[in-house]
């Protein structure tokens, strides 16, 4: 299956087969794909919480507006954002760059200082929105990887983020819930599985600029 075929195959799964579990090796691929998600400036203000425990799923269901995907999916992926994105966070990222790429401080100092100044001048809301944008980059990446691996998924924005934070103890880790992605395998009873994919015609959404 090529990538376009995989994207044609996928859909927002509304009913998972609760008896089917995503194998550990595929979960590992999901982890790796998440960590390889490109982010603005390469700062990677993201974490991925993976929930397989049924008791936790049941608790999350109570704050997911009754969306049964939360309990029938094999795993629940919760993309989280850092709550403290400041000079220390940026400096820590650049220290990692120095270690991995074996570069001297003077090579990256000007860009690091630019970013520290830029983020210092941003409001908390601007930084929050920037981090949320990165979370959606990760979501798109995970949806594509799941499709390529023939894993069904359903992106969810309908949930009480504060309650998710509380149940998963994200505040203790300096994190907030951004978006939720149940993954697993579609139920044969999911009425949406056989429906044709609806997209606007390509000529309406894509155009070339020649001048």
Q: How would you name each of these model-derived features?
A:
Residues 1-211:
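Acidic, surface-exposed loops and disordered segments
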């Amino acid at each position: 299956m090529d990538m376009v075929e995989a994207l044609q195959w996928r859909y927002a799964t509304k009913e998972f087969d609760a008896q089917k579990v995503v194998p550990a090796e595929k979960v590992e691929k999901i982890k790796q794909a998440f960590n390889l998600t490109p982010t603005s400036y390469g700062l990677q203000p993201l974490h991925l919480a993976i929930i397989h425990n049924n008791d936790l799923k049941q608790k999350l269901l109570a704050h997911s507006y009754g969306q049964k995907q939360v309990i029938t999916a094999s795993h629940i992926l919760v993309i989280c954002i850092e709550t403290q994105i400041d000079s220390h966070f940026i400096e820590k990222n650049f220290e990692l760059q120095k270690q991995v790429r074996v570069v001297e401080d003077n090579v990256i100092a000007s860009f690091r200082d630019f970013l520290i100044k830029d983020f210092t001048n941003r409001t908390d809301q601007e930084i929050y929105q920037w981090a949320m944008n990165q979370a959606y980059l990760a979501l798109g990446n995970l949806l594509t990887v799941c499709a390529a691996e023939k894993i069904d998924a359903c992106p969810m924005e309908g949930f009480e983020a504060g309650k998710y934070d509380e149940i998963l103890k994200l505040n203790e880790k300096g994190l907030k819930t951004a978006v939720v992605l149940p993954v697993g395998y579609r139920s044969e009873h999911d009425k949406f599985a056989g429906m044709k994919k609806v997209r606007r015609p390509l000529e309406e959404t894509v155009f070339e600029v020649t001048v």
